[in-house]
């Protein structure tokens, strides 16, 4: 095996180990956020939970806030990709879009429940609202020929807050309804 092939294999192993370590750290932070706010969480607690030393933690993150921001950024990258992949078909296939959205929420329910919960990051919700606003509000104003943009902003705030509340309730009641069922419920509420 040539030196470059050995290096490529080592990089793959390192990448897998890094991914595993970050996944364990993410899980530990999620568990701790169920119990207390980020301000009370120490790097030592996270490191102890996943049986690593603090130095390993600091190879990946500056502190717990940097870690939380990094995790949130990953979610927003997923959301942006999600919106860009579905933006053209949103009207024709809203049910498909919402099913995909609720499926994503279910797959990441532990983390999203914590982020939307009492110990979560309030700026996460604000970033989520702003992202949807940037993606949808201006397009909707033009598309629906809105004359009173201020009134439409109130409508938007009302709808987004309601959607977030609906998602919170679903997550907090252990997602009894399927993503398909939740998509139908949300679509009915938005159309009324």
Would you name each region that the model predicts?
Residues 1-36:
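Basic, helix-initiating cap at the start of DNA-binding domains
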Residues 1-5, 161, 169-192:
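C-terminal peripheral helix-coil segments that are non-catalytic and often amphipathic
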Residues 23-31, 35, 49, 66-86, ...:
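Alpha-helical structural segments
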Residues 32-65:
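Helix-turn-helix
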Residues 41-42, 113-115, 179:
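Short, hydrophobic secondary-structure boundary micro-motifs
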Residues 91-106, 110, 157, 165, ...:
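Amphipathic alpha-helical segments that line or abut small-molecule/effector binding pockets
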Residues 102-129:
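Amphipathic alpha-helical segments used for helix-helix packing
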Residues 119-145, 150-157, 161:
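Amphipathic alpha-helical packing segments from all-alpha helical-bundle domains
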